[in-house]
Amino acid sequence: MDGHNVVSRSSRHRKKRRMGRIFMLLVMLIIVGVGVYAGVKMLLSGDSLASASTIREDFVVTEVAAMGSAAKDKTAPTLYNGMKRKVVYLTFDDGPNAHTSELLDIMKNNDIKGTFFMLGENAKNNPDMVKRMYEEGHYPGLHSMTHDYSKLYKSGGSKNFIEEFQEAQSIVNDITGYKPTLIRAPYGSAPQIGEEFRGDIANAGFKMWDWTIDSYDWKYPGNPSAILSQVQSQLTEDTEVVLMHDREQTAQILQQVIDYIRSQGYEFEAYHPDQHFICNFRHDERL
């Protein structure tokens, strides 16, 4: 066999091997391409998108739930079926007295509950009214014994204040069998109640509410429509605490106040200890 034929056969053999490798490479590229196409198609399919959406929704729900638990004692709006609930807490100070029954009648006719911050002496003198209030689902809050500014605030400490509220608490407990812990300071909590004073109130086991809307009803005997105007001008937030009093003019305008608040999309609630939120002028989270 001459050298030329050997070289020729060797060259042809190398070409065949090279072509074989190229063919195998092309086959592998085709297989990879088919796999990528199938994967992309699957990712773009409805089932995969639904799964991705579900994962995201689960994450969002968990995130919102975590935020909700952290803000439970704050003034965050309550949610119902994914919508913000607008809630008004009607509160009445200084009773019970001759006008309290009128207020209770109106609220009963409207199927709404409120919160009554009572003076201990008035509660002692009107036990049947206190019983009715409690039995009809209203919260029996406390408003001191005397409402005396000098006695409550000018003694140099919290002692007189706390003793008056403890006495009022005992009176309501004796009448209803329930020991209320929510109080409202006469004349409001600021500026007369400082940080240490507030700490003493919290240590005595009380929570304290001021208000977000002042109806100034005490200023308008004979002019109840002015009370409605005050409420209308101040009703802006999703949660409002309205300050009123057990007065004749308040009873005269209460139905119109209720009608207006409802027309703005609000519901009514009484205070519930297990749904407490901060509503004091200093935003003290202890109270």
Residue ranges and their predicted role:
Residues 2-90, 96-109, 225-226, 260, ...:
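N-terminal pre-catalytic segment of deacetylase/amide-hydrolase enzymes
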Residues 59-174, 178-179, 260, 267, ...:
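Active-site beta->alpha N-cap acidic-glycine motif
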